[in-house]
């Protein structure tokens, strides 16, 4: 160690001085064994270095200790062994020091043990010094006598003899006291400022003595050791320094006699030297060297400076000492020389040595060292001899080697002797020789097997690959054999259906597996050069293996069909012939595809097991195995679904009586069994949404036998002796009695110990059927009466309603029936009563019949209907879903719990299905926020009870729960004896929760509450409370979901247009036409928007007007395509003809003079231009295309009546019906023009008639775009010749269409399109009229390819059908994704795109003998003065800027153009506020400019009542979008940092927030747990998050919530800046 200067201007750090001093002292001793200490607290933990130090100090060997401790107990044992050794060898008893503390690295304890060793050695040195002083002669002589010096033998002590040399100097600076001013006991230092050079004194020695060694006792800080010959030579004075700032010198006098060097360490007391007075480091002093360099020898005689340098080397430092070397006087000491000898294995060595260091001015000097090459051997008590140390060491090594070899030589000789004996034995005994050879073979074989075992996985892997290849070859061969020798020959004598039933998809399977075999064979040829990979082939082909689904589902039918076809002789002979040829039956070949996929899984599992993780194929094999398992699960799931459907069909075939269709696509069979109802046992079939009640004769007989057993037995539970349900229901057929719909129902267990339970709120199908049939019969009777009285020429029979509430055809059936009987709802039988019209919603095979005011009598999801039921009639009788409660009794308690569990699961699934439909209506705020607790919850809660909540895996805690407003509050439960106010009340938002039964071992009555963030388990006291909680929670969730109304739920509703006849003209009745029209959201349910509303009588209009005044106008609902356009037409006709006329008639008793019979015919013409994206509406002039409405269908409703006198009386007083509707459909296809006209007339021939002509013509450039005709959208796509091949690879007969890109692709490419951003594909066969928007984008593959393939890189070539998946993927990505933006820009900037030919729809309103149309301004319109033809131009604007209308010259009595509002003139429109009719503004010589309805800007003038009012703006209300609808976008930012995460955000315990490292990259947020060594361990991945909300938490101020589709993540940052960064990064993801 380099010495350190610890002194500074202030006091030194005493602790560091002690540590360094102790370390230096320990290292000086441990260096003998090549050991060292760097840190006392660490290096002494295992006790090994401490034991080595004790061995060096004591010179003894410690027998047993653990030299390489690895366990804690081993280290403690080493420390305890060291303590015991210190007590025995050094007599040091350690108190207050624990071995465990030293093992734990306690520095103070370790330094205490070292200090005890140092102090013990210092004390022993002092005692030795005192004993040696007592053995000296009384007189001190300065000469050395010639006689041998006799010494008094002393008892050897347990410390090193080397410690005698300057021991005081060595330990003086390691004092436990900080005050170093006092010197050690018996320490004498000579301090002087002058140089003393004593004169040498001659001594004589006897011839018999060679040398005499004299040891002086330790005096002061020096332990002089002197060996003097007969003659005295000048001594060498070497300065040394004590720990104090005083100057001390040590003079070494060396005398030689016969050129034999002697080691002298004796310093006379008078010999002193002086130093320059510079400060010297306290660590500078005399230290102990190794065993083999104990003493510094001087050779030769005379002065030291001229002595033998071989034995005397001097290496001073940079400074110079002021000591002067001169002769010294050595004193004769009578001390025995045994103290300086240390016994070793080879003899006595002189122990001790000097290593001096001095200092110069301003620096630290290197130590003064002298080498030792001689050693003195004590021959006897009086003689000793010096030997060369190197020679001694060499001799020792030779001797030791000889001893070791001699030891082992005997062993080897004995071993060779035994071998010779064994050899003779085996050579003479052949049996033993054979046994020896056998043993050797076993041992060698075991060794070789171990080597082979290491190479076995690779060998086994190659064998598995060969097995895959061979089995695939055999499998494809068998499929080809079935196709060639069974399928094709059987087509000659079997029907197509029979062939399809037997062989199913075996040809397609053969084609795909042939492709797999081809890839496997090609890979096997380049097996070693390809990296021995096979997993990628199965990954690529796994998606195509789903074709096995149809085959697996059809297998049972295939076997049954084979049995049936065996009656055909040709087929039987074919099977017999092939059986004899191939040795296998047809069924053996057909079972092969069923077994192939499981075989794939087994082979891949074995292959993955024998593949190392470092192998390049390991990852692909893992993925291939996963995909293969997914395929197997998919096939099995489809198999279960098919079997379930077959089970439903079987059950339906086993039922007798009148019942409806049970085999619905959504219906699944669950359970069947016997239950007791009304003291009768019945057979019940449970489906996922339906409970069917039947009667079985076998069951009845068993019931009778059960009664007898009950009478003979006193046991109340004797019913449990019934036969199992399977034994009962497998025989005979059952009679259908009733069925119950489970949607919205609840279970009640009023008797937990009994066998009975109740189902409340179930829908009764029989009651519903009877109500609907009664209602329909009444309507049919009324319709028949009306038709007999007023429609004598109409011989059409009234339709009879025949429906099935179970089938999807129920909606269409009841819709058509209601359309046919619409008249009967609105007939006025001379009672001056007006009717209401019903609105029917028919979409997605569902029906919604509501009242005219928009209310729904009942909501029920039963029998395949997911909407409300209700029909409004004159008597206000609503058709509602009848509900009832049924009480059932099981045959045993176990069977009861089984039934209740299955029923609860079905109800739970139905509620989840309805919740999923409302999911998009739930906002983030409703989902994340909870209602704060109010004390009123405790008093006014819907339900409250004490439940046990699961706190951990083994502990449950009682809590008091309150249910209110879709929130569940709970707090700690306090007993009734000591009631307390509730504290720490928590809340659970139930809006997205699910509740269902749960099975817990030690808690029998449990249910689980599933929230987005966690799952709660609750335990009830009995089953009654259990099902009560489940029912109430579900009811609360259901009410909340029903309160979420979608503003688009009334789109495409059907209304039955009602009209009332005049009280004075009872014989004049009208026949309304049912048309699709949008319903209104206002509370009055006004029908004035429809065309028929203009003919309501005065009382009805007054009633509606009064209701309108009491209610506020609401915005119109966004309409569907067809409904929106029709709404504009009807509203326009109603406004321009009927409403104002009715108003005028009601305010003026006499008809207007403008209603002249002699006026010429007036024609109103409305034209609709429909293109691929919009529809243009024009009035009078086809070229004025002023408004566009997106629509694809058109339906027109009109009802016009004239009185007998030829006057138009639009207020409904007198009408005569004559309707002429002509519908013309024109198809323009290049040069072909096809027109279809349909004309319908009803009523009598009158002198005055009104004609409504509707002609519809549309462009047929894009086939199927309009949606008309019998052909579906899929047929129209197939008719395009460019779609005969795949747009990507050119494969023939593509069957999939890409919705986003409008191309028709094959099955292989459809899987790639499906994975594109926003990719969506549909099967061409599944397309119908509902997918007309898809067809509009489909322009044909040739046009689409020309558009998308413009910017594809030149390096890519178009793939062919045989190319790999990767080639097709790269082509499709380059075609659509990389150039998507360029294509969009080019489309937006292309102004030369030709406008498609529009579809024109024209409505002609012809008034044959009508003078003019009614005047809209009844208050201020002047009477007409002339009767001339007038052409009125009316424009419907959509809020966009339009050119100023061109004035048209008109000739009329008043020359006025009727217009309610205008935006192109400076004239303001006058409006009447508060009244339904509005007075329009009369503009002279200007065309009528009417703005559109339901427009997107503030100029909308519709008030939803069929009138026009300026300022009544109705902005379009768009559908609420859920955060689930947000698409995934490419990542824009990357970020990482530490965040806190918790699952209990409301907790006040800060330890619940755990710190993780979050890394956001590629739209994925991954969080890791980082160890102290900075190693990451992945804890989870957060993907598909859609919104971020910042809100503070109790223990985290800067916290925010991350919303995903599965759960909520509560995160927090340390600073506000970090939180803002995270919010910006995550928000950039959610906004896209």
From Swiss-Prot:
Record-level GO cellular component terms: cell cortex; cytoplasm; cytoskeleton; early phagosome; membrane; phagocytic vesicle membrane
Membrane topology: Peripheral membrane protein
TM region(s), chain numbering: none
Boundaries of every IQ domain copy: 388-417, 432-461
GO MF: GTPase activator activity; guanyl-nucleotide exchange factor activity; phosphatidylinositol-3,4,5-trisphosphate binding; small GTPase binding; zinc ion binding
Residue ranges annotated for the Calponin-homology (CH) domain, each copy included: 16-122
KO phenotype (gene knockout): Cells display defective streaming during development under different conditions and a delay in developmental timing.
Pfam families (UniProt xref): ArfGap (PF01412), CH (PF00307), PH (PF00169), RhoGEF (PF00621)
Occurrences of domain DH (ranges): 460-638
Domain-related comment: The membrane association is mediated by the calponin-homology (CH) domain.
Matches recorded under PANTHER family: DH DOMAIN-CONTAINING PROTEIN-RELATED (PTHR12673:SF245), FACIOGENITAL DYSPLASIA PROTEIN (PTHR12673)
UniProt-recorded name of the protein: Guanine exchange factor for Rac 30
């Amino acid at each position: 160690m380099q010495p350190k200067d610890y002194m500074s201007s202030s006091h030194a750090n005493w602790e560091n001085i002690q540590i360094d001093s102790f370390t230096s002292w320990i290292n000086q001793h441990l260096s003998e064994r090549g050991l060292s200490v760097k840190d006392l607290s660490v290096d002494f933990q295992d006790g090994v270095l401490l034991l080595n130090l004790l061995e060096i100090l004591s010179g003894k060997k410690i027998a047993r200790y653990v030299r390489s401790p690895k366990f804690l107990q081993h280290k403690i044992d080493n420390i305890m062994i060291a303590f015991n050794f210190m007590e025995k060898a050094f007599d040091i008893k350690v108190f207050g020091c624990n071995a465990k503390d030293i093992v734990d690295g306690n520095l103070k304890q370790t330094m205490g043990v070292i200090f005890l060793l140092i102090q013990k050695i210092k004390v022993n040195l002092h005692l030795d010094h005192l004993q040696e002083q007592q053995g000296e002669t009384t007189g001190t002589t300065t000469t050395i006598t010639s006689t041998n010096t006799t010494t008094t033998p002393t008892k050897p002590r347990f410390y090193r003899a080397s410690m005698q040399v300057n021991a005081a100097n060595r330990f003086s600076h390691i004092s436990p006291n900080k005050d170093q001013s006092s010197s050690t006991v018996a320490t004498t230092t000579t301090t002087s400022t002058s140089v003393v050079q004593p004169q040498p004194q001659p001594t004589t020695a006897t011839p018999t003595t060679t040398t005499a060694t004299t040891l002086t006792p330790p005096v002061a800080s020096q332990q002089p050791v002197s060996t003097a010959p007969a003659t005295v030579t000048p001594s060498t004075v070497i300065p040394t320094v004590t720990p104090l700032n005083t100057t001390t010198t040590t003079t070494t006098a060396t005398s030689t006699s016969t050129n034999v060097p002697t080691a002298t360490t004796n310093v006379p007391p008078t010999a002193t030297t002086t130093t320059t007075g510079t400060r010297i480091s306290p660590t500078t002093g005399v230290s102990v060297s190794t065993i083999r360099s104990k003493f510094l020898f001087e050779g030769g005689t005379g002065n030291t400076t001229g002595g033998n340098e071989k034995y005397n080397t001097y290496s001073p430092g940079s400074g110079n000492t002021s000591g002067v070397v001169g002769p010294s006087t050595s004193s004769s000491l009578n001390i025995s020389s045994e103290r300086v000898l240390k016994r070793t294995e080879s003899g006595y060595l002189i122990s001790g040595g000097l290593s001096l260091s001095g200092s110069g001015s301003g620096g630290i000097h290197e130590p003064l060292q002298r080498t030792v090459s001689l050693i003195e051997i004590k021959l006897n008590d009086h003689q000793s001899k010096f030997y060369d140390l190197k020679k001694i060491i060499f001799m020792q090594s030779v001797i030791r080697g000889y001893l070791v070899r001699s030891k082992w030589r005997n062993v080897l000789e004995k071993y060779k002797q035994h071998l010779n004996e064994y050899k003779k034995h085996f050579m003479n005994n052949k049996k033993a020789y054979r046994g020896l050879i056998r043993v050797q073979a076993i041992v060698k074989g075991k060794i070789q097997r171990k080597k082979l075992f290491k190479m076995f996985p690779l060998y086994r892997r190659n064998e598995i690959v060969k097995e895959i290849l061979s089995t695939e070859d055999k499998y494809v061969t068998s499929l080809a054999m079935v196709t060639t020798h069974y399928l094709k020959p059987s087509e000659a004598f079997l029907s197509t259906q029979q062939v399809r039933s037997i062989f199913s998809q075996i040809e397609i399977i053969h084609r795909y597996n042939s492709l797999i075999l081809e890839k496997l064979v090609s890979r096997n040829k380049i097996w070693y050069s390809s990296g021995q990979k096979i997993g990628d082939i199965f990954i690529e082909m796994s998606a195509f293996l789903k074709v096995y689904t149809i085959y697996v589902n059809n297998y049972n039918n295939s076997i049954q069909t084979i049995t049936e076809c065996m009656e055909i002789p040709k087929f039987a002979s074919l099977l017999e012939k092939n059986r004899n040829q191939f040795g296998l039956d047809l069924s053996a070949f057909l079972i092969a595809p069923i077994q192939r996929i499981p075989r794939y899984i087994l082979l891949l599992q074995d292959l993955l097991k024998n593949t190392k993780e470092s192998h390049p194929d390991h990852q692909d094999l893992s993925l291939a195995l996963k995909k293969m398992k997914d395929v197997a699960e998919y096939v099995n799931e489809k198999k279960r679904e098919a079997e379930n459907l077959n089970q439903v069909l079987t059950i339906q075939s086993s039922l007798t009586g009148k019942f409806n269709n049970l085999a619905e696509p959504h219906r699944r069979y669950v359970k069947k069994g016997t239950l007791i109802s009304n003291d009768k046992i019945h057979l019940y079939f449970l489906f996922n949404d339906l409970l069917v009640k039947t009667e079985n004769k076998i069951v009845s007989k068993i019931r009778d036998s059960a009664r007898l057993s009950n009478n003979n037995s006193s046991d109340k539970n004797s019913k449990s002796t019934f036969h199992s349900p399977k034994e009962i229901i497998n025989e005979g057929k059952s009679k259908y009695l009733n069925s119950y719909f489970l949607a919205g129902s609840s279970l009640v267990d009023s008797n937990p110990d009994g066998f009975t339970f109740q189902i409340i709120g179930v829908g009764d199908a029989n009651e519903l059927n009877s109500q609907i049939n009664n209602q329909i019969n009444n309507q049919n009777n009324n319709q028949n009466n009306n038709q007999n009285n007023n429609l004598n020429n109409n011989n059409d029979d009234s339709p009879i309603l025949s429906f099935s509430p179970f089938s999807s055809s129920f909606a269409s059936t009841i819709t058509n029936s209601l359309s046919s009987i619409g008249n009967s709802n609105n007939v006025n039988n001379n009672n001056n009563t007006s009717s209401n019209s019903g609105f029917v919603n028919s979409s997605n095979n569902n029906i919604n019949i509501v009242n005219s005011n928009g209310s729904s009598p009942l909501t029920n999801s039963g029998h395949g209907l997911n909407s409300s039921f209700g029909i409004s009639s004159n008597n206000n009788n609503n058709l509602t879903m009848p509900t009832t409660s049924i009480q059932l009794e099981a045959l045993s308690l176990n069977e009861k719990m089984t039934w209740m569990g299955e029923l609860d699961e079905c109800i739970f699934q139905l509620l989840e299905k309805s919740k999923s439909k409302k999911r998009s209506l739930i906002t983030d705020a409703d989902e994340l926020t909870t209602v704060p607790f109010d004390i009123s919850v405790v008093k006014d809660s819907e339900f409250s009870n004490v439940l046990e909540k699961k706190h951990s895996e083994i502990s449950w805690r009682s809590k008091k729960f309150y249910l209110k407003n879709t929130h569940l509050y709970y707090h700690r439960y306090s007993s009734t004896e000591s009631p307390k106010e509730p504290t720490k009340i928590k809340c659970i938002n139930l809006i997205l929760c699910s509740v269902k039964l749960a099975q817990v071992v030690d808690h029998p009555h449990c249910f689980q509450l599933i929230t987005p963030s966690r799952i709660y388990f609750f335990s009830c006291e009995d089953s009654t409370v259990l099902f009560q909680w489940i029912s109430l929670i579900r009811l609360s969730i259901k009410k909340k979901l029903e309160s979420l109304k979608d503003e688009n739920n009334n789109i495409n509703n059907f209304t039955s247009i009602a009209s009332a006849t005049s009280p004075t003209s009872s014989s004049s009745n009208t026949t309304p036409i049912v048309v699709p029209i949008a319903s209104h959201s206002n509370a009055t349910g006004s029908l004035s928007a429809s065309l028929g509303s203009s003919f309501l009588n005065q009382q009805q209009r007054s009633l509606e007007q009064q209701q309108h005044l009491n209610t506020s106008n609401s915005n119109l609902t966004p309409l569907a395509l067809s409904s929106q356009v029709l709404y504009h037409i009807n509203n326009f006709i109603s406004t321009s003809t009927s409403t104002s006329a009715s108003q005028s008639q009601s305010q003026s008793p006499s008809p207007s003079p403008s209603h002249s019979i002699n006026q010429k015919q007036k024609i109103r013409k409305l034209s609709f231009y429909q293109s691929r994206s919009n529809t243009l509406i024009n009035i009078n002039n086809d070229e004025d295309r002023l408004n566009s409405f997106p629509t694809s269908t058109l339906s027109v409703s009109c009802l016009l009546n004239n009185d007998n006198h030829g006057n138009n009386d639009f207020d409904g007083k007198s009408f005569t019906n004559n309707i002429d509707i002509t519908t013309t459909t024109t198809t323009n296809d290049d040069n072909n023009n096809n027109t279809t006209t349909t004309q319908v007339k009803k009523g009598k021939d009158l002198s005055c008639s009104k004609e409504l002509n509707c002609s519809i013509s549309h462009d047929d450039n894009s086939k199927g775009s309009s949606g008309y005709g019998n052909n579906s959208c899929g047929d129209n796509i197939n008719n395009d010749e460019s779609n005969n091949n795949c747009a990507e690879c050119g494969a023939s007969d593509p069957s999939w269409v890409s919705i986003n890109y409008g191309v028709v692709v094959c099955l292989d490419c459809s899987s790639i399109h499906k994975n594109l951003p926003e990719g969506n594909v549909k099967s061409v066969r599944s397309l119908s009229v509902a997918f007309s928007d898809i067809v509009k984008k489909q322009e044909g593959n040739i046009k689409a390819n020309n558009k998308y393939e413009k910017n594809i890189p030149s390096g890519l070539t178009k793939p062919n059908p045989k190319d790999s998946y990767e080639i097709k993927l790269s082509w499709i990505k380059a075609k659509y994704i990389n150039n998507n933006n360029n294509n969009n820009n080019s489309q937006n900037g292309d102004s030369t795109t030709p406008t498609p030919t529009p579809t024109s729809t024209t409505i002609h309103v012809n008034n044959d003998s009508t003078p003019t149309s009614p005047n809209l301004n009844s208050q201020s319109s002047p009477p007409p003065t002339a009767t001339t033809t007038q052409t009125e131009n009316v424009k419907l604007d959509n809020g966009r800027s339009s050119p100023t209308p061109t004035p048209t010259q008109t000739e009329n009595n008043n020359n006025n153009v009727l217009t309610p509002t205008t935006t192109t003139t400076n004239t303001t429109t006058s409006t009447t506020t508060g009244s339904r009719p509005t007075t329009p503004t009369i503009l002279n010589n200007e065309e009528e400019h009417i703005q559109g309805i339901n427009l997107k800007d503030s100029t909308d003038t519709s008030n939803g009542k069929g009138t026009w009012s300026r300022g009544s703006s109705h902005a379009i209300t768009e559908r609420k979008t859920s955060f689930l609808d947000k698409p995934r976008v490419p990542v824009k930012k990357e970020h990482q940092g530490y965040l806190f995460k918790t699952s209990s955000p409301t907790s006040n315990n800060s330890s619940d927030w755990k710190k993780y490292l979050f890394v956001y990259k590629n739209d994925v947020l991954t969080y890791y747990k980082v160890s102290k060594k900075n190693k990451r361990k992945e804890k989870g991945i957060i993907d598909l998050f859609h919104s971020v909300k910042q809100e503070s938490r109790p223990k985290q101020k800067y916290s925010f919530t991350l919303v995903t589709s599965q759960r909520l993540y509560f995160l927090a940052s340390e600073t506000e800046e970090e939180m803002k960064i995270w919010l910006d990064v995550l928000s950039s993801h959610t906004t896209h």
